[in-house]
A protein has these predicted regions:
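Hydrophobic alpha-helical transmembrane segments
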Residues: 112-125
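Alpha-helical transmembrane segments and their membrane-interface exit regions
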Residues: 124-132
């Protein structure tokens, strides 16, 4: 797997520097996993595109995050390999929207006060965190979890 090139003046932009280091950690975590050559080639294409960017500006930061998301989506879809707390973060939002809002709506309608609509959000969030944490634990037990967390 290809490596990110060393950038001398990236330390001037703190956000870009942190994102670049995080992408490097993701690539290091992926090297431990045995990935097919097809997947490695796709990841290498993403890295080559990022290495070809010479200027460090706001578009560079956007490109780093885009490449990181592309790599995470690729390995999740093809191999079901996910970073730590991937499902917890995903299901927390799903729980709030799929369970929390309808529960709050029912609660608000039963009391007759739509101001209570927001009361379902923390309930849905708790349900989502519970479901996501159990899925993360299952992924860890099956060896499908990377030693890397998206921040």
């Amino acid at each position: 797997m290809k490596k990110l090139i060393e950038r001398q003046n990236i330390s001037e932009n703190l956000n870009a520097s942190n994102a670049y280091q995080q992408l490097g950690k993701l690539l290091n975590a992926l090297e431990v996993k045995e990935l097919p050559t097809e997947t490695v080639d796709l990841i290498n294409n993403e890295i080559e595109e990022l290495n070809s960017i010479s200027e460090i500006d706001k578009y560079f930061l956007k490109a780093i995050k885009e490449k990181e998301n592309n790599v995470i989506k690729l390995i999740e879809k093809k191999h079901k390999i996910v970073p730590r707390n991937y499902y917890r973060k995903l299901w927390m939002i799903l729980g709030m929207s799929a369970f929390g809002i309808p529960m709050g709506l029912v609660f608000g309608l039963s009391i007759g006060n739509f101001g209570m609509l927001g009361i379902g959000l923390p309930i849905g969030m708790a349900i989502g965190v519970g479901v996501g944490s159990s899925m993360d634990k299952k992924a860890f037990n099956q060896g499908r979890q990377l030693d890397f967390e998206v921040k």
